[in-house]
Structures are given as C-alpha cells and as structure tokens.
Amino acid sequence: MSSSQNFPYLPASSPRSADVVLYLDLNGVVHHEKVLWHPRKGIYMSPYEAAGHSLFEWVPILESLLEPYPAVALVLSSTWCIRPGYSATLKRLPASLRARFIGGTYHKHVHGVDPWNLSMFRTTPRGVQVQDDARRRKPRQWLALDDDLEGWPDSCRENLVACEGTTGLSNPVVQHELKEKLRGCHAGLSA
C-alpha cells in the first residue's frame, strides 16, 4: 500500500498533495460501468445495459467508508477528467466528497491540450496514469479504486482495490477490502 518504499517521503506542502490519496474511478466504481455520452444529453446510464441503475448510486457507500478518515484526499482517475471535465464532474458530487478532491490524473498543464497528447493519455493504461500521478504528488500512502484492471504495473497492484464494473462499491467484498486498506494506510502514517 505504501509508495514510500520507492520514493522518499516529502511532506504534503501544497493543496495538490496529501499524505494519503485515494485515486477514484467513477464508471464501474460509484455506479454501473455502462455509461453513455451524447452531445445533447451529456452523460447518462445505458437504459438497456444498466436498466434500474443511476449515476453515482453508490456514492453514499464511499462517503461512509471515508468518514473515519477525514485526511484522505481524492484524485479523479477517470475518463470523466476529460469529458465532461474535472470541474463539471465535481459539481455532480456531494459536498463531502468535493471537499476532498485535490486534482485529477489528467492535467492540461502536464499533458497539454493538443489532440495527440490527449490521445496518448487515453491510450495509457489506467494503472500507469495513476502511478505517474502518484510520482508527481508524492503522497506517503496511496490507494486506487478502479474497475479497469489491465496494465497495472506490478509495483502498484497492492495499492489497487479492484471493482467489478457491474457492482462496483455495492459489493461487500470490495467494501471490506477498501476499509482494510484505508485502515492500513492510517496505521502506516502513525508508525
């Protein structure tokens, strides 16, 4: 769980960093993975593949799991960083979660805005995106909550809490794993 084995500890000296960071994907984590986008409708659940589901339906579970750990910061690691964008995404989340966000894995200042750079970012495996961001932020501890399991570097797999895209955080096994890893991060800071 700790990235301090690979990187020297540097205290969180700016609002863009924190001692403990949770990299949060959205699709397949806080709601069903079958999300669609339309230029006029925006983002919505597939009425065929995710009937009965709604956007952000499992957010209350995340809020509950994070409540004992007010110092845990969130970083958006999702395609939502690009569309609809970081700021627009945060507006859709409850205030309790918005206050925890310190950024996203996609940064216009880091990755640029030209189509080639955007394409390169989109084709980079999620685990590599998260690893690169963790190297920039240098948190003492970090975790990732994601249903995109392909291409994660072996050195980062212990930080990953893997979700199944149709059940995400509604799965009690995932909830238990996240709870235990958050507890471990907290204990690691106290040691």
Residues of each region from the PLM?
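N-terminal amphipathic/basic-hydrophobic helices that include classical n-h-c signal peptides
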Residues: M1-S2, H32
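Short amphipathic alpha-helices and their capping/turn segments at secondary-structure boundaries
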Residues: S2-L22, Q131-K138
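A short, highly charged, low-complexity intrinsically disordered segment
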Residues: S3-S13, E63, G184-A191
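Aromatic-residue detector
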Residues: Q5-F7, Y23-L26, Q141-W142, E150-W152
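Alpha-helical substrate-recognition element adjacent to the catalytic core
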Residues: Y9, P15-G112
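C-terminal cap/substrate-recognition subdomain and adjoining C-terminal extension
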Residues: S87-A191
